[in-house]
């Protein structure tokens, strides 16, 4: 039985972020829909050919998305919220963009659908909305069109579909409450239709993704898989695909399904290959996810060979990435600034395809010399001086319980802070960043390229900070920010100023829609050689009598939004970052900054997928935040910010952070998230986001007032702040001014109504 290679998906955006640029040009009205569609076709063709040339036998088709693959599935099923529908009931690419962004070049603007994290990754999806009695039909044939494209190019392919049970699991009920699982019978005919169309095209295998099978699902959801897959069986071979965790706890459910193969993530799960081989039906194909799709490290192929070789020849076997390569940068070969040693430690998406080909060839032939040669740099890295810092390791070992305790409880601190800042009721602020204009990006780029000297660069940044302060004072905001003109990204900026990180030139990965990030890579022990944010915070504070927040990204978020080391625990990395940023808090305080925000938007996304593993993670995640913050004096107000979060199941840990103020993203959920804080009787101050910064729509004063009144029904008004959902980096100044003016007006109206 010959072993084949395949990937579960490939990065969509293009090496130079071509998709992002085409999307944003189209949204701005600067290019046509036909031009956008042409870029998509070009990228798909390029990526299929690149994977094929790298040694992939079965190419994924259907992994491309114009915004995200869950939203693509919603359109496939005809699941379009009424507010986003075309008048004639048709579905087009602008329908998709209205759901994701709230507006598109055609159609009426409407509130964007909710967005949240894809399992425990830094990728996002648009949450499907379900209503009682909803009807589904095949309305969006993107998958079938792309299959036709790939077949016309002569490729051997494997279409990719998000499975029906996981799709329902990922959604939310809107309107009258009901059990969304009852809709399963209604969406299955659409899946049957799609599979029939694929069978007509001669497709042998379809990858059907059911990552919900790695979760601790309620029994009713587990029971739903059998009738669902009974309905889907018989038209094509189905590769039931899971990732991000192991499947062993749900294996009894899986082996009862009428599918022909199973993909397992052997990187992030604890599944034993021998046990899987023993328990799976003998005629099933096993797809072994041996290459990490979520990191940038070169694989130890000798280790992977040993892990799987015992079952070679005993059942049909494919080797694959652990998950979609969407979460990895595209191509290491274009990284010209990484030094030779560090570069030899990495593998990006195309190199991971090459790793799969090397592994396939060795498993088919029994010849392992090429694997040993490939794996040699990994052995060298374990002993590199760039990895280990004795001073950092000593400081980490010396942490005590006192290092994570503020001097006094919140009630005492709040009195000191009220006396210091004398803020009005309903205090207004923003989350941190202001629009990253063409001028700001050009300034940073010129400096990075050496076209601008340090003095002129600093003068330019200072001017943008000054303008941000002027804008905020004109708007009447109560607590200001410096706007972060000097920062390219909230994680990358800190990584650039901390030892232990390296950076890529083109290591872009998709976050959501057209938003791409370039995560830093943790290659060694982390320390802070010098202050990072103090100079600009101090300068901004010198321009105004109002308080200016110091802005830090928290340790867990820096960890989650970086590519971490694989040779130490995540806890170790987080606490090393916390110690480095603890020194930054002390320096900001000494410079006269009285309010310091430590953003932890990723705290919840870092949760293990299985609830039974949560406690250990939350214990060290909370401790890392507290180590970071606890050096602050009582009169220094510590803020934190979180987004895309469901809080009700981690409220104990949110409270344990002991931040004086927490700002959260709530507008897309219509203040629904505040239920968690109300039920828990959260004791500290809260700033529920009053408008969605991911949409260019400007909220009205009345809309914001209504949300704040709804918030005040759950949280005492004296503990409420008024702020947007998130930072304003991706917005333009006209809409930012208009939205903030309405926000400030709404706060003033509520003060007068007291």
From Swiss-Prot:
L-homocysteine binds at residues 431-433, 484, 599. The active site is at 694 (proton donor). It catalyses: 5-methyltetrahydropteroyltri-L-glutamate + L-homocysteine = tetrahydropteroyltri-L-glutamate + L-methionine. Keywords: Amino-acid biosynthesis, Metal-binding, Methionine biosynthesis, Methyltransferase, Repeat, Transferase, Zinc. GO terms for biological process: methionine biosynthetic process; methylation. It is an enzyme of class 2 (transferase). 5-methyltetrahydropteroyltri-L-glutamate binds at residues 17-20, 117, 515-516, 561, 605. Pathway: Amino-acid biosynthesis; L-methionine biosynthesis via de novo pathway; L-methionine from L-homocysteine (MetE route): step 1/1. It comes from the Bacteria. One of its GO terms (molecular function) is zinc ion binding. Binds 1 zinc ion per subunit. L-methionine binds at residues 431-433, 484, 599. The keyword Methyltransferase applies. InterPro entries: Cbl-indep_Met_Synth_N, Cobalamin-indep_Met_synthase, Met_Synth_C/arc, UROD/MetE-like_sf. Its cofactor is Zn(2+). Its EC number is 2.1.1.14. Belongs to the vitamin-B12 independent methionine synthase family. Catalyzes the transfer of a methyl group from 5-methyltetrahydrofolate to homocysteine resulting in methionine formation. HAMAP family: Meth_synth (MF_00172). This is 5-methyltetrahydropteroyltriglutamate--homocysteine methyltransferase. It comes from Salmonella paratyphi B (strain ATCC BAA-1250 / SPB7). The gene is metE.
């Amino acid at each position: 039985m010959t072993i084949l290679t395949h990937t579960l998906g490939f990065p969509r955006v293009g090496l130079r972020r071509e998709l992002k640029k085409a999307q944003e040009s189209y949204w701005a009205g600067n290019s046509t829909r036909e031009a956008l569609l042409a870029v998509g076709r070009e990228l798909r063709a390029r990526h299929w050919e690149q994977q094929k040339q790298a040694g992939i036998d079965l190419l994924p088709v259907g992994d491309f998305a114009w915004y995200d693959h869950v939203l693509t599935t919603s359109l496939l099923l005809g699941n379009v919220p009424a507010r986003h529908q075309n008048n004639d009931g048709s579905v087009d690419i602008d329908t998709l963009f209205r759901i994701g962004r709230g507006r598109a070049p055609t159609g009426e603007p409407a509130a964007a659908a909710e967005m949240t994290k894809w399992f425990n990754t830094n990728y996002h999806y648009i949450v499907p909305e379900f209503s009682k009695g909803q009807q589904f039909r095949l309305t969006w044939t993107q998958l079938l069109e792309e299959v036709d494209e790939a077949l016309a190019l002569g490729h051997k392919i494997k279409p990719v579909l998000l499975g029906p049970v996981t799709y329902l699991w990922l959604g939310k009920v809107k309107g009258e409450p009901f059990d969304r699982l009852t809709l399963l019978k209604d969406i299955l005919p659409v899946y049957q239709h799609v599979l029939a169309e694929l069978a007509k095209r001669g497709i042998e295998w379809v990858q059907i993704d059911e990552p919900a099978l790695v979760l601790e699902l309620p029994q009713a959801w587990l029971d739903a898989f059998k009738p669902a897959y009974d309905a889907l069986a018989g038209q094509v071979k189905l590769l039931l695909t899971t990732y991000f965790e192991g499947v062993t706890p749900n294996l009894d459910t899986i082996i009862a399904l009428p599918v022909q193969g199973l993909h397992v993530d052997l990187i992030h799960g604890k599944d034993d290959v021998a046990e899987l081989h023993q328990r799976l039906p003998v005629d099933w194909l096993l797809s072994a996810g041996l290459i990490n799709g979520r990191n940038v490290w070169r694989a130890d192929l000798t280790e992977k060979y040993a892990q799987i070789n015992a079952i070679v020849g005993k059942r049909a076997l494919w080797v694959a990435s652990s998950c979609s390569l969407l979460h990895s940068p595209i191509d290491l070969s274009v990284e010209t600034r990484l030094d030779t040693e560090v570069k030899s430690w990495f593998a990006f998406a195309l190199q991971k395809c090459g790793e799969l080909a090397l592994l396939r060839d060795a498993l088919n032939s029994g010849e392992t010399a090429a694997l040993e040669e490939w794996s040699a740099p990994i052995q060298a890295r374990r002993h590199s001086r760039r990895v280990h810092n004795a001073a950092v390791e000593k400081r980490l070992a010396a942490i005590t319980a006192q290092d994570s305790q503020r001097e006094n409880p919140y009630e005492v601190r709040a009195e000191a802070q009220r006396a210091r800042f004398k803020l009005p009721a309903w205090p207004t602020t923003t989350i941190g960043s202001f629009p990253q204009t063409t001028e700001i990006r050009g300034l940073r780029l010129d400096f990075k390229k050496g076209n601008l000297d340090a003095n002129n660069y600093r003068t330019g940044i200072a001017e943008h900070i000054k303008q941000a302060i002027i804008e905020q004072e004109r708007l009447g905001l109560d607590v200001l920010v410096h706007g972060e003109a000097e920062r390219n990204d909230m994680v990358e900026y800190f990584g650039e100023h901390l030892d232990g990180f390296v950076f890529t030139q083109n290591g872009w990965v998709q976050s959501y829609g057209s938003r791409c990030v370039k995560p830093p890579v943790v290659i060694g022990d982390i320390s802070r050689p010098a202050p990072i944010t103090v100079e600009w915070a101090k300068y901004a504070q010198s321009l105004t009598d109002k308080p200016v927040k110091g802005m830090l990204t928290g340790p867990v978020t820096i960890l989650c939004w970086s590519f971490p080391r694989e040779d130490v625990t995540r806890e170790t990395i987080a606490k090393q970052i916390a110690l480095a940023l603890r020194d930054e808090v002390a320096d900001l305080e000494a410079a006269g900054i009285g309010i310091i925000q430590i953003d932890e938007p990723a705290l919840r996304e870092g949760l293990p997928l299985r609830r039974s593993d949560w406690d250990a993670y939350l214990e060290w995640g909370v401790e890392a935040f507290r180590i970071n913050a606890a050096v602050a004096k009582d009169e220094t107000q510590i803020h934190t910010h979180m987004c895309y979060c469901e809080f009700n199941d981690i409220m104990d840990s949110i409270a344990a952070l002991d931040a004086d103020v927490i700002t959260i993203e709530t507008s897309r959920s219509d203040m629904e998230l505040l239920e968690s804080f109300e039920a828990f009787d959260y004791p500290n101050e809260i700033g529920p986001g009053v408008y969605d910064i991911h949409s260019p729509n400007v909220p009205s004063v009345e809309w914001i007032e209504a949300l704040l009144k709804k918030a005040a029904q759950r949280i005492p008004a004296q503990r409420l702040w008024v702020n947007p959902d998130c930072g304003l980096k991706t917005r333009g100044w006209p809409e930012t001014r208009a939205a903030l003016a309405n926000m400030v007006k709404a706060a003033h109206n509520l003060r007068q109504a007291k």
